[in-house]
Amino acid sequence: VREAALESLGRMDGTPVLVRARGWARRPDALGAAAGQLLACRGSADDGPLVLAALREAVRGTGPDGPALWSLVDGAGRLGIAQAAPVLRHLYRETASSHLRGRTAQALAATDATFARGFAVECLWDCEETTREVGARHAATGDQRVVGRLRRLAADPAEEAEVQTAVRSRIGPDTAAI
């Protein structure tokens, strides 16, 4: 019954439930965790500190692969919580899930001022096409390794269309333009 109640909280919508979630998010229990996830999905920028606290607690409680992390990572990116960048960097490095790594890269692109010179470059070599796409959209091109990798991605007939579109949006039809 408890799990069903917590799941139903995530499906609720509207201002009254957000007001309640803001109060519950500070609780150190399952209701607090569910409230943090709800705020990550539907909250406003003012909810950033609560979402960040929920993200930190989820990492401490379940490690870098916990089920709550997906919505919290997405929320940190959606809300542009710059203070979440260190936690997101940790998750990017430590998660075993390539899909969560891709979502974390997207959140880092929105929260970490150093992303273009750091993790975005690493994203270009990731096994997940969505992560490579994030890297292609954001990696700083001052490094010759990045330029070479972007050219290879653009020329690779086996590369996913979304990745090639992202690369071409950066370099144009003439790959020598970089």
Cite the ranges covered by each PLM segment.
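Structural detector for internal amphipathic alpha-helices that build alpha-solenoid repeat scaffolds
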Residues: 1-14, 19-26, 30-45, 63-81, ...
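C-terminal, beta-strand-rich globular interaction domains
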Residues: 64, 124-125, 151-158, 162
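Short, 15-30-residue, compositionally biased linear elements
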Residues: 85, 113-114
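Alpha-helical junction/boundary sensor with strong preference for TPR arrays
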Residues: 28, 58-59, 95, 127, ...
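Buried hydrophobic core positions in alpha-solenoid tandem helical repeats
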Residues: 18-22, 50-56, 87-90, 118-121, ...
